[in-house]
């Protein structure tokens, strides 16, 4: 019985995420369409609402083509690992109750997201294609680089909250959002999440003129769909993490209001991701690295030191009464 309940809970957690990912792709195509003065998908079902289901059926019923001289085990494992790590990130996130309430929830989220680098590297190396390998090396360098700033920003917010659990972040933001007190961190966090999820204007892994389609160029059908699902799952989870860190709804009496509030804010942030894609051109690779190592990293380290010293100095001030 406990095993059945565990499996049921996990499925009840995973299935809504995958449905949300499917309709995020539809929202992206609709938004890009309207921003380019066209309709977007409007044939399959009423207003094109069945388009994600049709796309999924088409991809999973196609024959997965395996080129010669490939590493078959890694070719199959890498898309599976990508989606697994993307879904594992959700386990410590409170909505309002987490699937597993971890003491080091934020650190575990960062550790799981850094594991996704392995799937990207395997996906580029397994097909034995130079274009896929160059694309994966770019993606790995970009992901590892921006994880540094994400880690330091997380450390800075932990200095303000005083703990590693996500429930503590909710309690801290009962009266005011952390966005109001640490908006430079929030700004750098948002830009770093764009780079971490390989979204425009940092989608250098998909420079069509250079690398055809990046590290997943040799994938088709089901394995490609798994990579696609993993990418959009990461987008939603990163935006959800942004909400919890900086614009948390706070502990309310009604859990359903907490979840509704969180979903609305996550949707707004996801729409801003799509808006940025429609508005800005792609960065050059040197500009991408310059932004991180020369601008974001010194700033985040300085703010981390400030937050650490501020909390220590304030705790040393004697009470007024």
Swiss-Prot record:
Protein's name in the database: NADH-ubiquinone oxidoreductase chain 1
Catalytic activity: a ubiquinone + NADH + 5 H(+)(in) = a ubiquinol + NAD(+) + 4 H(+)(out)
Localization in the cell: Mitochondrion inner membrane
The entry's keywords: Electron transport, Membrane, Mitochondrion, Mitochondrion inner membrane, NAD, Respiratory chain, Translocase, Transmembrane, Transmembrane helix, Transport, Ubiquinone
EC number: 7.1.1.2
Pfam family, one: NADHdh
Protein species of origin: Varanus dumerilii (Dumeril's monitor)
Transmembrane stretches, start-end: 7-27, 73-93, 104-124, 148-168, 175-195, 227-247, 256-276, 297-317
Listed InterPro entries: NADH_UbQ_OxRdtase_su1/FPO, NADH_UbQ_OxRdtase_su1_CS
Family, similarity comment: Belongs to the complex I subunit 1 family.
GO biological process, one term: aerobic respiration
UniProt topology in membrane: Multi-pass membrane protein
Function: Core subunit of the mitochondrial membrane respiratory chain NADH dehydrogenase (Complex I) that is believed to belong to the minimal assembly required for catalysis. Complex I functions in the transfer of electrons from NADH to the respiratory chain. The immediate electron acceptor for the enzyme is believed to be ubiquinone.
A single GO cellular-component term on record: mitochondrial inner membrane
GO MF annotations, alphabetized: NADH dehydrogenase (ubiquinone) activity
Gene: MT-ND1
